[in-house]
Amino acid sequence: MATYKTASELTKMMIDYLGQRGMEVWRNNNLAVKGRAFIGRKGVPDIIGYDRKHGQFVGCEIKKLGDRISPEQFTFLTQLGLAGGASMLCSQTSDETIKLEIFKDGETKIFSWRESEKEFRQT
């Protein structure tokens, strides 16, 4: 059974999970700073990196319970998946459920987190 996780906890969980599966990934801090103009691209995922074996770009957006994906984030993930990258959306949808959606090559696969196994399983 999953318990409520913060965005930071979900991010760490996904960085560890993807790293164990051959991905070189890191947190992409893309936050606005008070008093400074935003310099960057809107919609870039919270976690970015690449597959060590194939060199494929990987992007994973994290959403804690109650958060929603922005139009810019949706567009970025869609374009990444259509361009041959692996785009992911990891979201906690209830206190018990963490869902991972992977969009790659025009196809979406949905997985659920198994806390006891520390593993996602396709649903």
Please describe what each predicted stretch is.
Residues 1-123:
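Catalytic phosphate/metal-binding cores of nucleic-acid and nucleotide-processing enzymes, i.e., regions
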